[in-house]
């Protein structure tokens, strides 16, 4: 169970903005943002599909998700691609519906 009182919660956006590395801690809980909503997970690695499902973007095939790296350009995440939430500079994620001709 994940609680806000957990001392091992790492807010990835704040670490990225502060230019700090997230400690690799087996008990870590990652706090991250997709669009304007904040989520918690104990999983360090999530696929693009999992991120879209967490954000309620169903079916995931109808949406795109981009990873925002602090100080860099957005990078598209594929549905099967795994993202490391502890990767240096990962700030947040943004989604957008795909045009029916995209995919």
What are these regions, as identified by a protein language model?
Residues 1-103:
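Ubiquitin-like/PB1-type beta-grasp interaction modules and other compact soluble beta-rich domains
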């Amino acid at each position: 169970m994940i609680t806000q009182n957990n001392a091992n919660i790492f807010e990835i956006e704040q670490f990225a903005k502060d230019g700090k590395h997230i400690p690799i801690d087996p008990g870590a809980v990652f706090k991250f943002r997709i669009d304007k909503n904040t989520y918690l997970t104990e999983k360090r690695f999530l696929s693009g599909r999992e991120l879209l499902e967490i954000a309620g973007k169903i079916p995931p095939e109808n949406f795109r998700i981009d990873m925002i790296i602090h100080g860099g350009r957005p990078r598209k995440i594929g549905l099967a691609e795994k993202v490391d939430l502890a990767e240096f500079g990962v700030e947040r994620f943004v989604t957008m519906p795909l045009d029916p001709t995209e995919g």
